[in-house]
Swiss-Prot record:
GO terms for molecular function: indole-3-glycerol-phosphate synthase activity; phosphoribosylanthranilate isomerase activity. It catalyses: 1-(2-carboxyphenylamino)-1-deoxy-D-ribulose 5-phosphate + H(+) = (1S,2R)-1-C-(indol-3-yl)glycerol 3-phosphate + CO2 + H2O. It is an enzyme of class 4 (lyase). Keywords: Amino-acid biosynthesis, Aromatic amino acid biosynthesis, Decarboxylase, Lyase, Tryptophan biosynthesis. Pathway: Amino-acid biosynthesis; L-tryptophan biosynthesis; L-tryptophan from chorismate: step 4/5. The lineage of its organism: Bacteria, Bacillati, Bacillota, Bacilli, Bacillales. Pfam families: IGPS. Its EC number is 4.1.1.48. This is Indole-3-glycerol phosphate synthase.
């Protein structure tokens, strides 16, 4: 019996095959927006997330333009958009809609296993690509990271444990994302940020904390660990006051 991540990657292989049948990448270059620049101060990457394998439907009928506009008005430094359809009920259309509304960096949040997905994300308006170490061989990670650079985009290289972290450090990527969620079990443990953050601080690398961030106390905790930003989805998608959440993020430590 495979893990949740295994099932997702198998589905991605099907989607990649379909993309090669139905999609022809465009060659035009376009302007992009930098997350690295945004992370010069503590930044919230606010996510458009309709559903997830662990929570089921979160906000299935979200008005993407309105949500993205609210995020930007409240002070988000970037917006993340789930483009996976099978497990998270997102789409590249959501990414395109977000791009039409936003002038801040946009992350394509998906399980990227092939260059053609990066081409599709680029065309949809992404500035940032998520590369998940747990989903890729070292060779494939290197290949896709170099392709992200070739496209003029930035990468968030995502890790969950020490072994994945060492692989990511060797890439010297734009940004490392510590995912507090174990993608094999989907359990969340915020202490991963503290454990792995120490090593990243030693290397003086730019990093953010992802998943399981719901409160002012969580924000304080990840800031103290040295994170330069947080990626927040569920808490914002279910919040009755998005502006209050952003106010909590301004807390000084």
């Amino acid at each position: 019996m495979g893990t949740i991540l295994d099932k997702i990657v198998e589905q991605k292989k099907v989607e990649v095959a379909e993309l090669y049948e139905t999609y022809s990448p465009v060659k035009e270059k376009r302007k992009t927006h930098s997350l690295v620049k945004a992370l010069e101060q503590f930044t919230v990457i606010a996510e458009v997330k309709r559903a997830s394998p662990s929570k089921g439907d979160i906000n299935l009928h979200v008005d993407v333009p309105k949500q993205v506009k609210t995020y930007e008005e409240c002070g988000a430094g970037a917006v993340s958009v789930l483009t996976d359809g099978q497990f998270f009920k997102g789409s590249f259309h959501d990414l395109e809609t977000a791009r039409a509304e936003s002038n801040i960096p946009l992350l394509c949040k998906d399980f990227i296993i092939d260059k053609i997905q990066i081409d599709r994300a680029y065309e949809a308006g992404a500035d940032l690509i998520l590369l998940i170490v747990a989903a890729l061989s070292k060779e494939k990670l290197n290949e896709l990271y170099n392709y992200v650079l070739e496209k003029g985009l930035e990468a968030i290289v995502e890790v969950h444990d020490e072994q994945e972290l060492e692989i990511a450090i060797r890439l010297n990527p734009h940004v490392i994302g510590i995912n507090n969620r174990n993608l094999k079990t989907f359990e969340v443990d915020l202490s991963q940020t503290e454990k792995l953050g120490k090593r990243l601080n030693e290397e003086n690398l730019l990093w953010i904390s992802e998943s399981g961030i719901h409160s002012k106390e969580d924000i304080i905790r990840v800031k103290r660990a040295g994170a330069k930003g947080v990626l927040v989805g569920e808490a914002l998608m279910t919040s009755s006051s998005i502006s209050n959440f952003f106010e909590d993020c301004k807390v000084n430590i």
